[in-house]
């Protein structure tokens, strides 16, 4: 019935569904079947972004905004070995540079989710591998704020 377009809700008795909860498997199944997933907002954008990413959520780290210059490469090198799912905030002006850095430090095939304007009218989430996003964000005039969720190292 979900594939026919009916709207359903996923409710957990243990907090936000799919955060340290097997509900993420349902979210992943929906994503794999091209079913849109939305999340009711909480106090921050990072939890809804993680909840709808389809990436492992039992252990994660919130990195916020990466350093702009000093320490950026060092931090990315450290994070390239991180096994937990990582969550980043990014501005529209630096999104392409950050994705390029992710490509260089994490590799082209690392799975990511990019959410834009969560809980707003132009909310959008795209999922794939880092290499899938470079062309789509190069030389684009973007608006809005982004949350990037990156799968940890296997």
Which residues are covered by each model-predicted region?
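Short, hinge-like loop/turn segments at secondary-structure boundaries
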Residues: 2, 26-29, 53-58, 105-106, ...
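Class I S-adenosyl-L-methionine
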Residues: 1-36
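Structural detector of well-ordered beta-strand residues that form the stable sheet scaffold
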Residues: 11, 36-40, 87, 113
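Short, well-ordered secondary-structure micro-motifs
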Residues: 21, 49-51, 73-74, 98-100, ...
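A contiguous loop/helix-start segment that scaffolds small-molecule binding in enzyme catalytic cores
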Residues: 3-7, 85, 89-154
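Short gly/pro/ser/thr-enriched loop/turn and capping motifs at secondary-structure boundaries
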Residues: 17, 44-47, 120-121
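Helical mechanochemical/support elements of P-loop NTPase systems and associated helical scaffolds
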Residues: 15, 22, 68, 72-75, ...
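Class I SAM-dependent methyltransferase SAM-binding "motif I" and its flanking Rossmann-like core
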Residues: 25-82
